[in-house]
């Protein structure tokens, strides 16, 4: 490898929150090696978050979900053809370095497919799947002070001589005018004022044990609307609309129900919030990345490792790991603290 890499592949396939947490790696690489070509390999579903990112030269999307779901001979043949095309594309890029930020077997296989002579990943004890170490040539153990996952990702840059102090990571996200305009139109239509005591609630989560009970979200929304004079907007994702409606269905004044949102529109919503309330989810980390104060609700996952990154946030962690152990009053108090009462 030359003293300064010519082409670097970042492999962080999913999910939304994890991709957000890895963004500072691209920023740090772009600052350290401004002439290097930076390419991010990511799942198709999360790719929109990275399109037009100022630190990246290219985004390559893959569909590992389709790889895993192939059952018929025709589907398998299509997957194989796609993998051959992907491998050729990666080899043609002539990567000097590939960095596996995910630590899985599938991410390791993609990292290996880049053909990069230097393939950096986590040491076996830090990888999510131990066999991931088979695909990397340089394995890193993050320092003790790197408690947050963002800082652990940045530790993977040490073999390249790049260092970012814990807590000093930088986030940037591309903005898209069309998405911003659609959300502006929605706000006007429902009478919401951006950043004016606007509390955005995100009741969903990828795992059921990371979800705060719907009844608690509803009680919080009612107190915010009726006692705190706050505006409340409830987000929802696939299969979550009924949950959001149950939270919105309170006596007037009631929360607004968000429209269906893609990733660009979700980012636009979080930019307009005064505070985001959510569990350990992608929308929470997206809000933190755009600079919106967050109230994070944590049960089975570590708030020290996975909490909203940066200053100005509040975290409530259930001592027994159960989301139902977090009651409404302390969450309300945390929101009011952020709002300035």
Task: Identify the residue ranges that each predicted region occupies.
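Catalytic machinery of carbohydrate-active enzymes
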Residues: 1-341
């Amino acid at each position: 490898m030359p003293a300064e890499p010519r082409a670097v592949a970042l492999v962080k396939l999913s999910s939304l929150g994890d991709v957000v947490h890895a963004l500072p790696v691209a920023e740090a690489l772009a600052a350290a090696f401004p002439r290097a070509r930076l390419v991010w390999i990511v799942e198709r579903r999360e790719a929109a978050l990275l399109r037009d990112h100022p630190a990246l030269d290219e985004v390559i999307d893959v569909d590992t979900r389709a790889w895993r779901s192939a059952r018929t001979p025709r589907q398998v043949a299509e997957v194989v053809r796609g993998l051959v095309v992907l491998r050729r594309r990666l080899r043609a890029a002539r990567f000097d370095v590939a960095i596996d930020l995910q630590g899985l077997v599938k991410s390791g296989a993609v990292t290996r497919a880049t053909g990069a002579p230097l393939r950096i990943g986590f040491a076996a004890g830090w990888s999510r799947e131990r066999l991931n170490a088979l695909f990397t040539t340089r394995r890193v153990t993050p320092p003790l002070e790197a408690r947050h996952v963002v800082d652990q990702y940045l530790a993977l840059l040490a073999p390249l001589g790049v260092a970012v102090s814990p807590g000093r990571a930088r986030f940037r996200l591309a903005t898209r005018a069309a998405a911003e305009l659609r959300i502006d139109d929605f706000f006007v239509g429902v009478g919401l004022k951006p950043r004016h005591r606007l509390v955005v609630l995100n009741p969903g989560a990828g795992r059921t044990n990371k979800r705060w009970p719907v009844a608690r979200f509803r009680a919080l929304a009612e107190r915010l609307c009726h006692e705190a004079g706050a505006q409340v907007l409830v987000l929802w994702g696939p299969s979550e609309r009924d949950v959001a409606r149950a939270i919105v269905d309170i006596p007037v004044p009631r929360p607004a129900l968000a429209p269906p949102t893609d990733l660009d529109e979700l980012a636009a919503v979080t930019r307009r919030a005064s505070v985001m309330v959510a569990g350990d989810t992608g929308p929470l980390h997206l809000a933190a990345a755009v600079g919106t104060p967050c109230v994070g609700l944590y049960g089975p996952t570590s708030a020290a490792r996975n909490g909203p990154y940066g200053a100005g946030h509040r975290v409530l962690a259930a001592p027994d790991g159960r989301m139902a152990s977090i009651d409404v009053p302390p969450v309300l108090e945390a929101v009011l603290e952020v709002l300035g009462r």
